[in-house]
């Protein structure tokens, strides 16, 4: 859908299958993505635009990426391999950042430094261990993996047998290295450093595959930001906690989350000019796909009456039923109909709810008896109940939570205050990882 909209906006015509295929091949197909595109690295990983970026969902990993400033897929793979409990406990992250800033980790040998050049002198990947075993220790290729397994088993607590195996492998490594021109002390030092890093070495092929997925996300964020935001929000629709976090991230990028609206919402999240995002109908309880199809096919609606009745006075709705309309009223999703407020048909949304939902059957029966009588019945009930007070804030919050699963934080905290918190770098406590200390804000839900 996003591709179709993109092509329509540029060409002013409805795209055919080949138009969509060609656009995809030129812009989104894996072969079209340049993994060396520095604009992507700088826009996302350096500036910290994290909304929906794979491998960068926690504050800790985000901070590490901004410190490490990746410029290649291998850099991303290295960062994600380091950002694990073992390497972090051993301060490998600090060693890596220092190395990126010119304080290279030196093994005392040019051949070793060359093998570890792409990871700034640190042994990060198990594949590097195999290369060291072959090129430095002189192990035949088929024996290299045995060394890797022996070292890994020793490191993860494989018992006495594993320790003995690693020790015997050490002798073989040192002997092979000496045959390759190393003195015994240097060879032993290289092996001991291999042992140190082996507890944290990660599988490179696995890390690179994940890094590519992360880069694809960053690529979409860089070149198709609005569409990426919409896709990200759609993916969060079934999880209220994650959706609240997504809202916070997206607001931090300058976007405004608009209210659901009968005339502007669609089946998917929609981006409007001015960095505005409109929710999908389908992310709200009570509004099914068949109801959405009917809503969209009959738009635009100029007022409430044109939404409920045909020009001849007959009832207009079938799939768009009472439950769906009630959901729209509860989340105040009829603003574009301009029928709620002072000197309007309805004083507030509670008034509208009481009239339309409360007298639904009576209004429909009146319509069946005589076209236009239903409209008159609705107006009469509305005029007779104008003293209806609106829902208080707690009730509005409950309405939204019941329909959406979570409430927009702007219902609790004014947008101006949120903007100041974002500007100062103060996050919601939901965005702070359990093992980290940071300053955050929160709202008290209830006091017993």
For the regions a protein language model found, what residue spans apply to each?
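Noncatalytic, beta-rich nucleic-acid-contacting surfaces in large DNA/RNA-processing enzymes
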Residues: 1-448
């Amino acid at each position: 859908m996003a591709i179709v909209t993109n092509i329509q906006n540029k060409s002013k015509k409805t795209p055919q299958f080949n138009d969509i295929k060609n656009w995809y091949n030129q812009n989104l197909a894996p072969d079209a993505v340049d993994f060396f595109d520095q604009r992507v690295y700088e826009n996302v990983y350096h500036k910290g635009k994290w909304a929906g970026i794979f491998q960068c969902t926690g504050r800790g990993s985000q901070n590490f990426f901004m410190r490490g400033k990746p410029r290649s897929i291998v850099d991303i793979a290295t960062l994600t391999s380091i950002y694990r409990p073992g390497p972090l406990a051993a301060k490998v992250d600090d060693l890596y950042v220092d190395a990126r800033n010119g304080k290279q980790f030196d093994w005392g040998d040019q051949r070793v430094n060359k093998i570890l050049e792409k990871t700034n002198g640190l042994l990060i990947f198990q594949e590097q261990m195999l290369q060291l075993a072959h090129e430095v220790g002189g192990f035949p290729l088929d024996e290299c993996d045995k060394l890797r397994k022996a070292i890994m088993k020793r490191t993860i607590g494989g018992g006495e047998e594993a320790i003995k195996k690693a020790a015997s492998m050490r002798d073989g490594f040192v002997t092979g290295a000496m045959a390759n021109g190393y003195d015994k002390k240097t060879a032993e030092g290289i092996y001991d450093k291999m042992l140190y890093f082996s507890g944290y070495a990660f599988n490179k092929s696995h890390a690179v595959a994940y890094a590519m997925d992360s880069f694809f996300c960053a690529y979409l964020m860089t070149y198709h930001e609005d569409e990426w935001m919409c896709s990200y929000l759609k993916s969060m629709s079934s999880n209220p906690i994650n959706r609240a976090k997504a809202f916070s991230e997206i607001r931090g990028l300058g976007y405004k989350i608009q209210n659901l609206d009968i005339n502007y919402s669609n089946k998917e999240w929609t981006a409007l000019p001015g960095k505005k995002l409109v929710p999908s109908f389908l992310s709200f309880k009570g509004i099914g796909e068949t109801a959405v199809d009917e809503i969209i096919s009959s738009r635009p609606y100029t007022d409430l009456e044109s939404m409920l009745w045909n020009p001849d006075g007959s009832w207009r709705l079938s799939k768009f039923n009472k439950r769906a309309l009630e959901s729209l009223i509860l989340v105040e999703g009829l603003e574009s109909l301009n029928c709620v407020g002072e000197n309007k048909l309805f004083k507030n949304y509670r008034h509208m709810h009481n009239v339309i939902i409360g007298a639904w059957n009576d209004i429909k029966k009146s319509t069946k008896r005589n076209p236009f009588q239903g409209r008159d019945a609705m107006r009469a009930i509305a005029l007779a109940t104008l003293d209806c007070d609106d829902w208080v804030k707690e009730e509005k919050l409950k309405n939204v939570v019941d329909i959406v699963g979570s409430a927009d934080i702007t219902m609790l905290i004014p947008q101006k205050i949120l903007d100041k918190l974002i500007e100062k770098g103060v996050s919601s406590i939901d965005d702070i990882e359990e093992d980290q200390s940071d300053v955050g804000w929160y709202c008290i839900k209830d006091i017993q």
